[in-house]
Every structure is written in structure tokens, then in C-alpha cells.
Amino acid sequence: MTATSELDDSFHVFDTTLRDGAQREGINLTVADKLAIARHLDDFGVGFIEGGWPGANPRDTEFFARARQEIDFKHAQLVAFGSTRRAGANAAEDHQVKALLDSGAQVITLVAKSHDRHVELALRTTLDENLAMVADTVSHLKAQGRRVFVDCEHFFDGYRANPEYAKSVVRTASEAGADVVVLCDTNGGMLPAQIQAVVATVLADTGARLGIHAQDDTGCAVANTLAAVDAGATHVQCTANGYGERVGNANLFPVVAALELKYGKQVLPEGRLREMTRISHAIAEVVNLTPSTHQPYVGVSAFAHKAGLHASAIKVDPDLYQHIDPELVGNTMRMLVSDMAGRASIELKGKELGIDLGGDRELVGRVVERVKERELAGYTYEAADASFELLLRAEAEGRPLKYFEVESWRAITEDRPDGSHANEATVKLWAKGERIVATAEGNGPVNALDRSLRVALEKIYPELAKLDLVDYKVRILEGVHGTQSTTRVLISTSDGTGEWATVGVAENVIAASWQALEDAYTYGLLRAGVAPAE
């Protein structure tokens, strides 16, 4: 189904993640993936979702067929992508044009050549025939009741080479009935001032409704998109998280946030901007790429503060070091705990974790010194909030949080004659007055330790059954001891509803891993509401 947007038609947010974004190296979308992303984008509230090129490959053809049946679009209209008719043919008889109509999409994007050299060398036809191809295809699709957008490929490079011909393609498309003519910086080499000047000139000379499609090869795709809007473009083409071929496309999320929060344009349905961070991360999950922590607006570090001076100011007024309220885009402010942290950082971090330090300057001072001491030894709490919370609670309560007492542990790796390895770990500990000895095998010494600790504790604490180790990172810290260098391990653990990170540091990677595992299980029990042992 195709939605009817609650917004007027004066400005378009057009997403091309499913076509252009899918060209990113490392992204391989199934039909199910494309359907899932389409649902997320519709939920976000974009006006148009370009689904792919029906007829060009079976996957895109299947996507359009299934999307019509399986998705009840609330906000977006589904768009089919294709090219103008072949040179010397008739649009009404062109198989590729027919496939666009057969897709059922009520909106169609046509890619057209606007660079004279591309017409002559790639299409191998004349400049006049290229204009006829544009006019014939647009007119035919409009006669079939379709809305038509025309992407002028390589427009800005073509404009520099032959401005009159590039403008004639725009004029031809518009006069044939194209609803929007999109100027594409296909090679991504333009800068904002250049984009703004060209868009303004083309708008004045042709009177066409213009859009912008910017690639990010100079790192300017978002800026170029906004520069085009400044010059009068009313249609922006973007991809979720900036996915796209080579280095990517204009990132949907910074563009939309800038339009809504900086330009004051309502380009999404009411309230949808607050879903932006969630949608960004959900789409990253579908394409199986880790969300960029430093992505504007939606990255976990977008509103993270580390320096003590910043924290002191934020304690007085968050706006002093933040350009917007993070909640406007569904994100949160985070205080990073490091050796740069001062008292204000610790107090704010405690508040974030739900620990009221009550203005206890002595306690806060102890925590500051403890953090600096630990980071000097190689620990990092910026990425290990759970370990920091355990440290903070230990200082506040005067003793570590204990659910179990470890007597000893060991991990053994055996090399076998056939070249295989056997990994076994044994843990001896006390929990609720009971001495427990547990042994387990794993696909590595750390996995064996994790399993043996789980075996030892699950009978006492069944809450641990739902914990999963989801990420494991090892870093050899700088030093002069070679194989004796200090090792830092970061472990991420999930209980199905949330995720937390813990850290361990030791000269031995297994010992560092054990520390992080102990913290992970301790925090998991704390998170589950289990009371610690007396």
C-alpha cells in the first residue's frame, strides 16, 4: 500500500538506502532485509523510499511484489528506479520502462544522462536523441498516471563541461512533466559554494522544481545537500547512516535533523524526530554494520563529555557544551569517566547511574583519585560503564559489591597431535555459604572460563542463565616489555534487554579477561535486582 503523507508536498525527504545505500562495499541485502529497512524508514516518516530497480534483477522485482502485499505504509510512498528508454526505441515498447510500470509503484525515478561526454561515450548516441529519450519516457510515464522524478546523473560535472546542454536536460524533463528534476553530484567532487551557485542558476534559468543527490567523496555530502536547499532545492535524496558506494551518500539523519532543528522546516510527521537514534541503530543492525559511535546526532558519543571543564559547565547548564538537547533526536547525554575527569564529571556520572553522591566531597575526591590511579595502570572507564559503576558503589559503600568469593581459577589449553586444541577451565568459589567447584570446556580459554563461571553460579543465581557475552576486545597497551606488555580486555554482555561493558587489565590476557568476566556477572546480578551477599 502507498501512504498519504500528513505533510504537504512543498518539501521532499527521499531515501535511497535500498538502492544507492545497498551499493556500499560489505552490504548485501536480502529481500527480507529490504522489507525490514523499508518498515523502519516508513516508521521514521520519510516521504519517499526508493526500493530498487524492478526488472533489473530478481531480488528487486520480488521486493516490489512483496512490499505491495506485506507493508502497510503509514508515511512513505514506494519509488521504483530505472532509466530512460533505449536510444532509437519507443518508451511505450521499452521492456525496462514496462517493468517500472509493472512494479506497481506510483512514483518512478528515472536516471538520465546530463553530461555531454557521457551521452556520447556511454550511451553512444547523439545529444538530441538523449533529450528525446528523456522527454518520451517522462511523457509516457506521466500518461500512465505516475509521478516522475528525474535524476540528472553527473549533472555538476556536466554543467562545468557544457552548462547549456546540462540545463537543456533539466528543461526537457520539466517540460515533459517531471515533478522534480534532481541534480546529482555523482562523483562527489563538488563543494558547498559550488553547489549553491549552480543550483541557484539552474533554478533561475529553467524554473524547474529541483532536488539534490550528493555523494560524500569530499566529505561534504551533508553540507552540499543543505547548500542546495539554501539555493532553492525542495527535494533531498539521502541514505540511512550515509551508506552508499565508495565513501557513501548524504546521511539522512544529519540532513533531517538540520532541516528540522536548524532550518525550522517540518519535514517529518510530528514526533518522529525523537525516533531518529533508534531508527539509525535499527537499520545498522539489519545491514549488519556496527553503528558509528561518532556519527552526528545519533552516535553514542554525539553528546558524550570527557573533560572536567566541560563537565563543570554542563552541571550548570547543559546548553553550554551541547548544540541541541539530545532528547530531541532520541539520544542521551553521557559523562565519560577518565583521568581527565574532575569532581563535576564524577557527580554527573553518579547522577546518570542513579547514585546520589549527596555532595560528599571526600567521597567524590576518592573516586577521582581512584579513577586516575586505575587509568594510569591501563584501565579505561569511558567504554566500561558497568565496571565504573561497580567501582563507584564500592567507594560509596566502603566495600566491593560481592555475590561470590573466588577461591581460585585456572585455564588450560592442550595441543593435540592432530593439530586441534582442547580448552578447559576450572573455577573454585563460594556463593551463599556454599563451596562450588566447576569445570567446563570451551572453544578458547576465555570461553572455557566464561562457561565454568556460569556453571558454578547458575544454580545459586538462575538470573545468570539469560546473560550472553556479545563482544570481546583485546588491546596490548604501549610498553617496552614485548610479550610481557600489559593487556586490556573489554567485554560486552547482554541480558536480552540491555547491554553493558566491563574492563580488565593484567600482564596476562587470561587474567585480564577474568577480571572483566567477574565484573560482567556481578553487574548482571545487580541489574537483575539481586541483593548482594552480606
From Swiss-Prot:
Pfam family, one: HCS_D2
Keyword RNA-binding (UniProt): no
EC number(s) stated in the UniProt entry for this protein: 2.3.3.21
SMART domains associated with the record: LeuA_dimer
GO molecular function list: (R)-citramalate synthase activity; 2-isopropylmalate synthase activity
PANTHER family for the chain: (R)-CITRAMALATE SYNTHASE, ALPHA-IPM SYNTHASE/HOMOCITRATE SYNTHASE
UniProt-listed InterPro entries: 2-isopropylmalate_synth_dimer, AIPM/Hcit_synth_CS, Aldolase_TIM, Citramal_synthase, LeuA/HCS_post-cat, LeuA_allosteric_dom_sf, PYR_CT
Catalysed reaction, written as an equation: pyruvate + acetyl-CoA + H2O = (3R)-citramalate + CoA + H(+)
Domain Pyruvate carboxyltransferase: 11-274
Function noted in UniProt: Catalyzes the condensation of pyruvate and acetyl-coenzyme A to form (R)-citramalate.
Taxonomic placement: Bacteria, Bacillati, Actinomycetota, Actinomycetes, Kitasatosporales
Protein name: (R)-citramalate synthase
Keywords linked to the UniProt accession: Amino-acid biosynthesis, Branched-chain amino acid biosynthesis, Isoleucine biosynthesis, Transferase
Pathways per UniProt: Amino-acid biosynthesis; L-isoleucine biosynthesis; 2-oxobutanoate from pyruvate: step 1/3
Family from the record: Belongs to the alpha-IPM synthase/homocitrate synthase family.
Gene Ontology biological process terms in this record: isoleucine biosynthetic process; L-leucine biosynthetic process
